[in-house]
Amino acid sequence: MLFRSADISGSVAAFARFTLMLVYAIQGQFSKVRSFVFIDGIDEVTDFFRGEEDIANAIHRVNTEADVVWVDGHSDYGHAFEVFWEKYGKDVGPKTTVLLLGDARNNYHASQAWVIKEIRQKARHVYWLNPEPKSYWNTGDSIVGDYGTHTDGVFRSEEHTSEL
């Protein structure tokens, strides 16, 4: 099973569009994919993509129907990950691969990196794709290193979203 969770906040708007297109493509190829989006809240959007022939409709539903704002709509990875763990952690198992997508810019909120550690202990693999250049990682409010220590790898996504 593949769990995919993507930041769709303003700081990664172009990347978010790319990741939603990726979700659409992956869900069309595999039967056991669950997709989540977050800002400071998190929501499962698997059904938004399932059986949808028009990716624009699926993305529109994510943008208008997904419950991803908890307080103020500024990224809070820690809170989103805690809610994920509370609601869906029981579904992560030894056959699960988790793909996390985002810049890890947390607006100086608590990282709650323990959640990623717990997920990694239960899952087969955990990977992180970050759209920012590596030179930006762990600068300012970026806490990708806090999370990365609990993954099987953090990679810069070689995005070309302007071409999409």
Range-by-range predicted roles:
Residues 3-20:
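MIDAS-like acidic motif and immediate structural context at the N-terminus
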